[in-house]
């Protein structure tokens, strides 16, 4: 039965990407964001995505194989390979802009899944290694599904920082990005904007 469900999902996902019909969200995500700083700028992003109760129930049913209420490292690896790795083609629903430059999001590290109060949270790191200079110090970070199958309530209410935080004075705010409007022009994504200056 499980294999049949995964096969059906595999058949349906391409239709979601190419269908011209108006979509509406089927999955909802409450995000948290941490920005890891390095000696030269931004090393990468830590996403923590908590899914709605219905999608969480599916994750638990399908991937908590020993029914202990946890997603082990082995179970998380299986989940990633079968139900998340395909988002690599879409930058893991993450856009990063530095001035006019679109920073490619191509790799994911340290994927894990936590179950708490019957809700599943994906945590993962996106390595970026973005150097910052006084002339080019502003970075925009967005997370959204352009096809609107999944609604990510981004930006989060707060942003965390880790890594070489003592080396930088950080300012952050939010801003709409009209150039990235999607869903037939109805939705304008909101970015987290950070500005880094050596402390």
Regions found by a protein language model. Give the residues of each.
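N-terminal signal peptide c-region/cleavage motif recognized by signal peptidases
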Residues: 18-20
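Structured domain cores in non-transmembrane regions
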Residues: 55-129
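Early extracytoplasmic/domain-onset interaction patches
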Residues: 25-51
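Mature, soluble, non-transmembrane domains
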Residues: 97-199
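Short, hydrophobic/aromatic beta-strand segments
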Residues: 44, 57-61, 134-140
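Positively charged n-region of N-terminal signal peptides that target proteins for export
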Residues: 1-6
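Bacterial N-terminal signal peptides
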Residues: 7-16
